[in-house]
Amino acid sequence: RMRRTLAMVEAFRADDGETPLILMGYYNPIFSYGVGAFVADARAAGVDGLIVVDLPPEEDEELRPVAREAGLDFVRMATPTTDDKRIARVLDGASGFIYYVSITGITGTRSAAIAAVTEAVERLRRHTDLPIAVGFGIKTPEQAAAVVSAADAVVVGSALVQKIFDGLDDSGAARAGLVEAVLGFAGSLAEGVHGARRDARAP
């Protein structure tokens, strides 16, 4: 599956060399692939950075230095339970941006509390100049717009996956209009973000 993922990156890069691509997943597939081989192949395919969700700072020494030496950003994650002492450890060695997990629990199952997210982002900004992206629990253009008023970026994953799932028939094949539905939803999220930024710049 990792090779298929990297092949998808290569195919994307054939048409788009500008959009940043961050791979997000778990460490075991990287370990099984071989850290050095994975980093080299990911970089060659056109990957820009990594988010390894189950690899805390204390356990990333096999991967992070190799990734950074190859020019891949190593994005770290902060959560609502990350206190000021822990933040320092999370930020040490992080690059690219910080991914703030807006809710605890499993992604896609709850809605982010915008006020709490704003407070958390402000706290993170006191510790780092890295951009801050917020994800987990963001499902609508309105939520995305509200979050980006405080953060630098919004990450939407589960809502897009659900949109794809809703467009499959009982055999798992895509129904007519699935691609258009997914693109339309992604466009509405983007417009929510862009609209919020336009409003913020307005006099």
Regions found by a protein language model. Give the residues of each.
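Alpha-helix-loop-beta-strand connector modules within alpha/beta enzyme cores
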Residues: R1-I22, P65-T79, A115-I132, E180-A200
